């Protein structure tokens, strides 16, 4: 009786695995969405805490703000999941992406207004809820591109792609904030987030 040998792990197996993922219809267009959808958020969100520190916020005050807004972000993710089931992938990414862009741009209102605790909490809560909604929509579409029995590896690759450009942009946000100022940086981040929705539109129109 001939025993079928399992394919040994190695670079060749890995390349064949991911080639199958990338050869799916519409996958290259989806990668362009992954690379760009969170760019505005990555650019702006990294500078929220430094901006508040520059306006006199203590570590304890920032910790409390982070805790409360993180809980709001979880709530936003739950709400986004419910709305995603009704709206579908395309409309969810557009709507939640628009809210995400508005949320990060609204941080410009906090420049010079760090002493207004109520305003800081209101805008930060809105931004985190919008971020949670947009993230869950993005992850849901990522799961739809995962192949049966390869979900873990396929999702991991997409997550790495999503973080690749966003991580580079986020790392440069400090230099841009010094050059442009906080207000301009947040407005630019919102504009980038809004502009990148055109990539979402193009991808889904091509997939129709």
Predicted regions located by residue number:
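Juxtamembrane intracellular "pre-TM" segments in multi-pass secondary transporters
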Residues: 2-31
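Short amphipathic helix-loop junctions that connect adjacent transmembrane helices
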Residues: 46-62
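Helix-to-loop junctions at the C-terminal end of transmembrane segments
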Residues: 76-90, 177-178
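C-terminal ends and interior cores of transmembrane alpha-helices
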Residues: 98-115
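Hydrophobic core of transmembrane alpha-helices in multi-pass small-molecule transporters
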Residues: 117-134
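Intracellular juxtamembrane helix-capping segments at the cytosolic ends
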Residues: 132-147
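A late C-terminal transmembrane helix in Major Facilitator Superfamily
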Residues: 149-178
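Multi-pass alpha-helical transporter architecture, strongest
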Residues: 187-208
């Amino acid at each position: 009786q001939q025993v079928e040998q399992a394919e040994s792990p190695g670079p060749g197996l890995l390349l064949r695995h991911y080639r199958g993922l990338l050869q799916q219809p519409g996958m290259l267009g989806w990668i362009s969405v992954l690379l760009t959808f969170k760019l505005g958020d990555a650019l702006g969100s990294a500078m929220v805490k430094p901006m508040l520190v520059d306006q006199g916020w203590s570590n304890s005050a920032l910790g409390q703000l982070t805790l409360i807004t993180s809980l709001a972000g979880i709530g936003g993710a739950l709400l986004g999941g419910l709305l995603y089931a009704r709206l579908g992938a395309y409309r969810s990414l557009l709507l939640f992406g628009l809210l995400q862009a508005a949320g990060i741009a609204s941080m410009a209102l906090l420049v010079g207004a760090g002493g207004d605790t109520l305003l800081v909490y209101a805008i930060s809560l809105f931004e985190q809820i919008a971020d949670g909604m947009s993230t869950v929509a993005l992850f849901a579409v990522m799961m739809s591109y995962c192949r049966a029995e390869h979900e873990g590896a396929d999702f991991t690759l997409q997550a790495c792609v999503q973080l690749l450009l966003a991580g580079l942009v986020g790392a440069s946000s400090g230099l841009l904030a010094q050059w442009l100022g906080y207000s301009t940086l947040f407005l630019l981040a919102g504009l980038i987030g809004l502009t990148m929705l055109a990539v979402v539109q193009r991808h889904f129109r091509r997939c129709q």
